[in-house]
Amino acid sequence: MKIRLIRLWLSIGLLFTVSIAMADEKSCNELIAESEKLWADNQFDESDKRLDEAMKTCPKLAEPYWRKGRNIYERLESFDRNQKPEKKELIRLYMEVETFADKCTELDQKDGHCWLWKGVGIGRRGTTQGVLKSLFMASDVEDAWVKADSLGLTYRSEDGTSNAKCGVSYALGMFYRVVPEWLCHFPLKQIVGTCGDLKKSITYQRSAIACDPNAIDNNKELAVSLLCHGQKYNQPEEIEEAKKILVDLQSLPETRVFDKIDKEHARMLLADISLACGYQRDKQQEQSKEAYDNDKQ
């Protein structure tokens, strides 16, 4: 009789625990949904509050962490180059993006979104410091984004303006353009662990366009890669294709917080196509081998 009673109470206790866990999960999903709507309205601070609450309620749930990192990134991307925080503060904030992504991967190694935002955090820290000063981090960025791509990315915003699968193609395309191709020679590639590849950059950016043809940033980045490759390897048809893209994207609807900046930068690139290879939304990058050698002396 006692054993039966014990079993009964254990069953009731287990059922109660499961019910609480299910209620918490529902609550967290609701909080994440609220944070998503606030993110879509560029209300990043309010979105953060919902995510913080979700982290407390469901501490083993990975999703709120990559979303928190995304909020930091997009908040910073909304600033024009001349209006961003000081370099030291930028680096600190991008390290926060990476920290949130690391927590995300700890909770779910197979969530590709965690790896996508880990790469973003490291990558933006690198462009803030300068690509040539950050080459030691390049393979970490590449590895994170390749892993994200291989794991598969399912996130797509409700309004269709953000798609993680398109985003990782965009990110890798940008990576293979900004990291210099001269690193591909021995022994530099062996030291750094990776190198640029402009053909691969164009391939990834075309994939991003195929995935989301109306995204202003996808169009701009394809044009930038075409301009860079076209000038470097004397491909005038690529330069003309790029110029047409930069003109045409001006008529695309602005749906993301940084779209206005990207349209301005498209006009800037049309005015001076020599900027293409080292172009980044946050900061123009020095890429030359001479600058790299001088910096090492």
Sequence positions of predicted segments:
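Extreme N-terminal leader/anchor segments
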Residues: 19-63, 78, 239-242, 246, ...
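Bacterial N-terminal signal peptides that target proteins for export
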Residues: 1-10
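Bacterial N-terminal signal peptides
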Residues: 9-17
